[in-house]
């Protein structure tokens, strides 16, 4: 139940009492209508009313994880946006990407970022990587009603595990289903409409112990292959200079490649495909 309005201007007791370290749990008591998936929807499907985002790939490398996403959003058979961003830092040592209903997905990611920051401020420490994945799973589960009407969001989460015994193997990847089930993946994963083709490419080229640089190129290669067969996935657009978003997370934290760095990788991939279209 939402907090009652006080005509005196005082904050409701809910805002001044000791509460939970979960911001989304607080919001569910203070203003539940603001949570993704909590707004009432009319009967029927709404899948064609919003842009949908795909495809995201993640690759475990020596000492971290690489996550990359294409830039295309579609509405049915139309390209709704050519330069949407689908990969973001969740906090200092983790990344999150999303596929599905773009508006809800971006809102979910922003709420997740606030959730992790709120926990750290209240508890004075970071959540464990498993704890972060479980918090994200709960948020995805909260959107199940909207997902049943076509507005599904499926995130991908990856991070550097500060508690790992071996820093070289500290990069971990988590996938989720539409009901919020979290699953840890080994080596690599992909999500979105082009994920079938991206994972097929990763399966052939992935090797345990890849360097971060090699994993970045492999991620762009996988997105190129996905775009080659999936109309909802956009490949490197050399004409408009629109390239995939590529991010890394290592012991030094998260890092987003600059446009120039991503352009260099994408142009090398395209040049290689000119000589060998099949990769």
From Swiss-Prot:
Reactions this protein catalyses: Cleavage of peptide bonds with very broad specificity
Regulation (activators, inhibitors): The formation of the proteasomal ATPase ARC-20S proteasome complex, likely via the docking of the C-termini of ARC into the intersubunit pockets in the alpha-rings, may trigger opening of the gate for substrate entry. Interconversion between the open-gate and close-gate conformations leads to a dynamic regulation of the 20S proteasome proteolysis activity.
Gene Ontology CC: one annotated term: proteasome core complex, beta-subunit complex
Gene Ontology molecular function, alphabetical: threonine-type endopeptidase activity
Record pathway: Protein degradation; proteasomal Pup-dependent pathway
InterPro entries: Ntn_hydrolases_N (IPR029055), Proteasome_sua/b (IPR001353), Proteasome_suB-type (IPR023333), PSB_actinobac (IPR022483)
Proregion residues excised on maturation: 1-53
Active site (UniProt): 54 (nucleophile)
Entry EC no(s): 3.4.25.1
Any one biological process term the GO annotation gives: proteasomal protein catabolic process
The entry's keywords: Autocatalytic cleavage, Cytoplasm, Hydrolase, Protease, Proteasome, Threonine protease, Zymogen
Subcellular location as annotated: Cytoplasm
One Pfam entry name: Proteasome
Function: Component of the proteasome core, a large protease complex with broad specificity involved in protein degradation.
Subunit structure: The 20S proteasome core is composed of 14 alpha and 14 beta subunits that assemble into four stacked heptameric rings, resulting in a barrel-shaped structure. The two inner rings, each composed of seven catalytic beta subunits, are sandwiched by two outer rings, each composed of seven alpha subunits. The catalytic chamber with the active sites is on the inside of the barrel. Has a gated structure, the ends of the cylinder being occluded by the N-termini of the alpha-subunits. Is capped by the proteasome-associated ATPase, ARC.
Protein family according to the UniProt entry: Belongs to the peptidase T1B family.
NCBIfam families per UniProt: 20S_bact_beta
Name listed for the protein in its UniProt record: Proteasome subunit beta
């Amino acid at each position: 139940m939402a907090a009652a309005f006080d005509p005196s201007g005082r904050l409701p007791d809910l805002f001044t009492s000791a509460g939970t370290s979960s911001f989304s749990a607080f919001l569910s008591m203070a203003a539940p209508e603001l949570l993704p998936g909590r707004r009432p929807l009319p009967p029927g499907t709404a899948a064609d009313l919003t842009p949908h985002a795909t495809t995201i790939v993640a690759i475990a490398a020596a000492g971290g994880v690489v996550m990359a996403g294409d830039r295309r959003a579609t509405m049915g058979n139309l390209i709704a946006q050519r330069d949407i961003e689908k990969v973001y830092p969740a906090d200092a040592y983790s990344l999150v990407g999303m596929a599905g209903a773009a508006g809800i997905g971006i809102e979910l990611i922003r709420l997740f970022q606030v959730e992790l920051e709120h926990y750290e401020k209240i508890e004075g420490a970071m959540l464990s990587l498993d704890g972060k994945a479980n918090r994200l799973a709960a948020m995805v589960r909260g959107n199940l009603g909207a997902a049943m009407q076509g507005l599904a969001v499926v995130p991908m989460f990856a991070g550097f595990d500060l508690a790992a015994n071996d820093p070289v193997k500290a990069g971990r990847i988590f996938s989720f289903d539409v009901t919020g089930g979290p699953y840890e993946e080994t080596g690599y994963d992909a999500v979105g409409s082009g994920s079938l083709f991206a994972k097929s490419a990763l399966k052939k080229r992935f090797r345990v112990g890849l360097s971060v640089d090699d994993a970045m190129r492999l991620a762009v290669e996988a997105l190129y292959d996905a775009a080659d067969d999936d109309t909802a996935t956009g490949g490197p657009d050399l004409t408009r200079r629109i390239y995939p978003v590529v991010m890394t997370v290592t012991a030094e934290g998260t890092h987003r490649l600059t446009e120039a760095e991503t352009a260099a990788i994408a142009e090398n991939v395209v040049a290689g495909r000119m000589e060998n279209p099949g990769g």
